[in-house]
């Protein structure tokens, strides 16, 4: 199989394996802690087993990096590395909601491989059958349930007040998230819409479908800007700061960008230098993804103002 065929086939294989377990009680059982520090649920283990079964069945000489297992090599000289989040949106998945996807990205296997090295990416809806994939420099594609290609519908909305958007809160101190995002949420909630999906990959694909105009995760910006608040992040992450990891966005950031969206970190900087095989605290990221650059600029300005309203000291912890 070509790299593109491998990425699409693996995405479908994981999706088909996981789908019968959506919303099932056994999927809710916490079974351990992932290499990233996040909680591992029973449904995550089912998804991880699907990865290995596919690689062994297809006899691939490849490495893969996932949330739960870290880096695993198959074959003497792996030609590429797959960056896989078998379920991005585990919490929605165990509840049986739609906001959960399979994420598979392909990059050449090299030391210090980064987000900018991802060549192919695929996102597959688990509850539904839509697929989103992209090749770097080749545009993005949205494949419907019947196999036909759909047209990307990036929203032209430029006003925050009219922009439907998502933000992330898992293990991020909400008392600070609320202050930093207060201006944005107050503006959008009535005439745009504010949503919480617990899946950045799902949210980024909604830019392509025209259901969202923006997705925001400022957790790591707060962690970096306010070192005095680190203990609060440690408490919420059960001893380790939890945030946006490279595997969360390895495929989705490429797909959204190739579709024409504007995707940066929450400072407005490129994410291309993010190391793909590193879940350490220094490699945690933030994100601001929007359907157009004008909205991106306005949201970034509002984020700067919101972060400026925060005064986090050790007494705030």
Predicted regions and their residues:
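Acidic, Mg2+-coordinating active-site environments of NTP-dependent enzymes
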Residues: 52, 140-145
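Buried hydrophobic positions in well-ordered alpha/beta secondary-structure cores of metabolic enzymes
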Residues: 44, 89-90, 207, 256
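N-terminal subdomain of lithium-sensitive/metallo-dependent phosphomonoesterases centered on the IMPase/IPPase/PAP
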Residues: 1-87, 270-271, 300, 309-317
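General beta-strand structural signal in soluble alpha/beta enzymes
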Residues: 63-67, 93, 195-198, 216
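DPxDG-like acidic metal-binding loop motif
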Residues: 77-138
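An extended, acidic
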Residues: 14, 18, 128, 135-138, ...
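Structural motif
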Residues: 62-63, 80-82, 101, 120-122, ...
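Short secondary-structure capping/junction motifs at helix and strand boundaries
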Residues: 60-66, 111-119, 142
